[in-house]
């Protein structure tokens, strides 16, 4: 992969400023090659995510049921993270238990029927810094979860 019309280069499609700021040598050959080195690409993308506050083991995107006031969401929750405990007080419910002080943003994804609501944590935000499309970021999460599930079941190969 040489580049895109937008100027992104290499396998990871880094724009020039991201290449300058986040690309790293992942294979130890003392040079950065995002055009041919898979190790450099993986290390560079990991560096990008880490520098955008990726938190190992933190939730990415939680499926939720909600009756939250849309006006409150548009005024507060889209501009800054809201603690999970506050979401729960406002009527958001989800399976599982998570740190009540962890901050999340609420997103509604349009479907053919009703919107699907998701609480997005810090790791989802880190992905949206790599590509600002919410749909792209959601696809990354769902693919990664599928790979992880396959690895856990022994049905996926690295």
Regions found by a protein language model. Name each.
Residues 2-115:
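Flexible, glycine-rich surface segments
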Residues 97-158:
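C-terminal functional modules
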């Amino acid at each position: 992969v040489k580049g895109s019309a937008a100027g992104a280069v290499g396998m990871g499609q880094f724009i020039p400023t991201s290449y300058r700021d986040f690309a790293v040598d992942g294979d130890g050959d003392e040079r950065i090659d995002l055009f041919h080195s898979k190790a450099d690409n993986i290390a560079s993308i990991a560096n990008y995510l880490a520098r955008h506050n990726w938190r190992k083991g933190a939730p990415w995107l939680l499926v939720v049921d909600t009756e939250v006031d849309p006006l409150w969401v548009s005024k507060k929750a889209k501009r800054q993270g809201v603690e999970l405990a506050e979401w729960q007080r406002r009527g958001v419910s989800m399976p599982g238990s998570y740190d009540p002080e962890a901050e999340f943003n609420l997103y509604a994804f349009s479907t053919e029927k009703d919107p699907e609501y998701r609480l997005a944590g810090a790791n989802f935000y880190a992905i949206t810094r790599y590509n600002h499309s919410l749909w792209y970021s959601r696809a990354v999460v769902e693919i990664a979860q599928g790979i992880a599930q396959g690895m856990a079941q022994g049905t996926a190969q690295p």
